[in-house]
């Protein structure tokens, strides 16, 4: 009898870390501005030509008490069909890599960005969104939320120098009066450059919510004018 109890306790202890690590309450959908990325990371900017739209950085599960990362050890499944690779690459390119060819796209270096996002973030929602679903649903969010169009509603366009408050309020209105997450990088002796904009959703991805104030990166943009590089 004691042996059975011991085995049950051991099983519970083994399963608990998975349950805790996978307990996410919301999702942050993060899109990046390619010119902003390259302004912040000039030595890493390898994609040519650069996309002229906001592209996906990732979909990041979290809860309201801590940031969730690397929740499980589930491996990434490489795409082997070029059309599948290209469809994902159109909205989720790796700006730190040149475009591959039909001959070498299967090499992990051309899928390492997706592998990183899956292992670091995707595994934290794996109990609800297995790998294929995680990537497809993230791309669907990109199709529904065009950040350039949202910014244009406030007459904010690439090449302009808006205030951080105007960018924040424009996105706020575009997503039904919910708080977004902005991220800027300030090059030496320059104005902060807009790099990323995040929109937060319920765990089911059905409803936009305020991005939690305790994890906002908007402070990286300062309080004045920012650069929206063209």
Annotated model-derived regions:
Residues 4-22:
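Cleavable N-terminal signal peptides of Sec/SRP-targeted secreted and luminal proteins
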Residues 7, 55, 219:
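Functionally constrained cores in energy, signaling, and assembly domains
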Residues 8-9, 63, 125, 206:
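A broad, structure-centric signal for solvent-exposed, well-ordered loop/edge residues
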Residues 17-101, 106:
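Betabetaalpha-Me/HNH-type nuclease active-site subdomain
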């Amino acid at each position: 009898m004691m042996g059975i109890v011991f085995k049950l306790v051991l099983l519970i202890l083994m399963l608990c870390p998975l349950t805790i690590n996978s307990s996410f309450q919301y999702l942050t959908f993060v899109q990046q501005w390619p010119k902003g990325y390259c302004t912040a990371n000039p030595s890493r900017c390898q994609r040519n030509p650069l996309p002229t739209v906001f592209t996906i950085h990732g979909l990041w599960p979290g809860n309201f008490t801590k940031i969730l990362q690397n929740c499980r050890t589930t491996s990434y499944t490489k795409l082997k069909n070029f059309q599948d690779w290209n469809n994902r690459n159109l909205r989720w390119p790796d700006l730190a890599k040149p475009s591959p060819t039909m001959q070498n796209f299967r090499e992990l270096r051309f899928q390492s960005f997706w592998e990183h996002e899956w292992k670091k973030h995707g595994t934290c929602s794996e109990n609800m969104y297995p790998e294929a679903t995680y990537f497809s649903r993230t791309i669907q969010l990109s199709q529904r939320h065009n950040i350039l169009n949202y910014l244009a509603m406030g007459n904010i366009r690439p090449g302009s120098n808006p205030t951080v408050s105007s960018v924040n309020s424009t996105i706020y209105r575009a997503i039904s009066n919910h708080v977004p997450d902005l991220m800027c990088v300030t090059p030496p002796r320059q104005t902060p450059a807009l790099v990323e904009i995040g929109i937060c959703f319920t765990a089911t991805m059905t409803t936009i919510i305020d991005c939690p104030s305790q994890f906002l990166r908007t402070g990286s943009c300062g309080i004045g004018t920012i650069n929206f590089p063209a």
